[in-house]
């Protein structure tokens, strides 16, 4: 453990942020991290809690409690406290090969399950400790290419380069298999590259990691739309195993009048256009969907909706409203949501903080949905009719659904982004490989194996939309199954 009395001696201290009105002037990361010395003090707060739920990764109430990767959190907290940064990095990478990603975008399931947080009211700064470890590793030159000492002679094609694709590629390459990753976009990274804005995950962080993987022998092929322009049968015939890691990219849409109005977009298309234009030309090409000078309506209150808020503010939108279908969560845990369950409480993310600073309001309007999009004679979006909702319980099934109250209001807007989640993987890749899907629209599997010989599946394409950390866990577990299939056993 770290310092015996650390959780009593020190209070929680986290990184500060660039002020909201200053940071929305650009798309840069905005956290001002603690010094290594300050981070060592924070690591000292990790207590000898007996049952470290922070690393449990168990499902409670349908949600994860603790880290899905089962990171050895108490171990590397102790090592950080002692100043043994290189050893802390080694212990961290035992379970997580991509801490530079999770330390930036993970919602810190570990901290929500932290015993210190339950005892003192403030958890250990696990995510920021992780960030300090990995960035110290890069700064000191400890993170560099380490190709496998021998090759097995087996080849694996991985379709998709998002979190699960990168994870399965990493582990199979460590094992010595020849790994080729096919990505349909022009850059590697999938969700990490185009689904998460640059201010949340700077794309140089992804590129830095990809260069190491390439130096270790992983081959990346971009602009390769397998199942589309690239024949799936050719891939099947050319590799000893194939892993489908194409995500759950079929977005949930709104089937309401006026959906065809010019100015209504799926959120993922919006975020992709902005990041691509930023990387290609620093917005000089004018190809990004642009919220400048426009009122923006965002439908959906999850991470993607929040990212749309932050992006629209940086572009210079004139107003912002975000619709949330469900009731506003409580500020404190309810009696039926005890620790160490994930806390179902009201959270204020960076997008809401920035909107409050810019417009003096939280953009979220709870228990609402779009009834109709309004448009002018040219088909341009001019507004939306928004219905208020109320929960209603079905006496026969016991299920609760949100139904209209009959009360409505109209919001004048010129852009609307639908961030209502995803309903499964896209059809064409699954159909091209002939793999079966389940009722939820995900590829059906038996221990990551599909119904087609030598074709595996992992990540959101298998489990449905989830977190980056779950994608990394899926890739790690799937790699072991692929290795077992190829070699008859696995040491992953």
Task: Please describe what each predicted stretch is.
Residues 89-96, 109, 129, 192-240, ...:
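N-terminal Rossmann-like dinucleotide/flavin-binding domain of flavoprotein oxidoreductases
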Residues 260-293, 392-465:
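FAD-site-proximal beta/loop scaffold in flavoenzymes
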Residues 132-150, 208-228, 251-315, 437-451:
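Glycine-rich dinucleotide-binding loop and its adjacent helix/turn
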Residues 305-308, 461-489:
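A conserved FAD-binding loop/helix module that cradles the flavin
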Residues 177-193, 320-330:
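Glycine-rich FAD pyrophosphate-binding loop
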Residues 155-180, 304-315:
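N-terminal Rossmann-like FAD-binding beta1-loop-alpha1 element of flavoenzymes
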């Amino acid at each position: 453990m770290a310092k015996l009395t650390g959780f009593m001696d020190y209070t929680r201290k986290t990184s500060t942020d660039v002020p909201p009105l200053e940071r929305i002037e650009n798309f840069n990361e905005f956290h001002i991290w603690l010094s290594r010395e300050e981070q060592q003090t924070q690591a000292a707060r990790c207590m000898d809690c007996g049952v470290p739920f922070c690393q449990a990764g168990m499902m409670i109430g349908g949600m994860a409690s603790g880290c899905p990767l089962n990171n050895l959190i108490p171990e590397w907290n102790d090592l950080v406290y002692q100043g043994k940064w290189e050893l802390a990095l080694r212990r961290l990478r035992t379970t997580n090969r991509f801490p530079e990603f999770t330390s930036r975008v993970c919602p810190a399931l570990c901290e929500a399950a932290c015993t210190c947080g339950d005892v003192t009211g403030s958890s250990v700064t696990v995510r920021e400790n992780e960030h300090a470890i990995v960035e110290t590793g890069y700064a000191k030159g400890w993170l560099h290419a380490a190709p496998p000492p021998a090759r097995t002679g087996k080849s694996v094609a991985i379709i998709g380069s998002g979190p699960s694709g990168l994870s399965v590629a990493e582990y199979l390459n460590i094992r010595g298999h020849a790994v080729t990753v096919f990505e349909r976009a022009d850059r590697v990274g999938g969700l990490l590259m185009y689904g998460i804005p640059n201010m949340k995950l700077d794309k140089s962080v992804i590129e830095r990691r990809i260069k190491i993987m390439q130096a270790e022998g992983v081959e990346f092929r971009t602009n390769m739309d397998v199942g589309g322009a690239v024949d799936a049968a050719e891939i099947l015939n050319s590799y000893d195993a194939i892993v489908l890691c194409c995500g759950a990219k079929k977005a949930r849409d709104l089937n309401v009048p006026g959906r065809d109005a010019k100015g209504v977009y799926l959120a993922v298309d919006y975020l992709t256009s902005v990041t691509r234009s930023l990387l290609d030309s620093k917005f000089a090409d004018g190809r990004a969907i642009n919220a400048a000078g426009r009122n923006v309506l965002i439908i959906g209150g999850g991470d993607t909706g929040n990212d749309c808020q932050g992006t629209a503010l940086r572009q210079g939108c004139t107003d912002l409203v975000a619709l949330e279908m469900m009731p506003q969560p409580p500020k404190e845990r309810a009696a039926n949501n005890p620790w160490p369950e994930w806390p179902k409480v009201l959270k204020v993310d960076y997008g809401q903080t920035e909107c409050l600073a810019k417009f003096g309001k939280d953009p979220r309007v709870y228990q609402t949905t779009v009834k109709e999009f309004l448009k002018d004679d040219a088909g341009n979006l001019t507004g939306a009719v928004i219905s208020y909702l109320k929960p209603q319980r079905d006496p026969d099934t016991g299920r609760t659904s949100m139904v209209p109250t009959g009360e409505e209001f109209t919001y004048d807007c010129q852009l609307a982004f639908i961030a209502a989640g995803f309903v499964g993987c896209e059809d064409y890749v699954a159909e091209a490989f002939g793999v079966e899907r389940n009722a939820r629209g995900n590829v059906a599997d038996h221990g990551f194996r599909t119904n087609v010989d030598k074709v595996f599946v992992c990540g959101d394409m298998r489990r449905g939309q989830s977190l980056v950390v779950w994608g990394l866990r899926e890739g790690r577990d799937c790699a072991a199954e692929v290795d077992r299939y190829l070699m008859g056993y696995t040491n992953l």
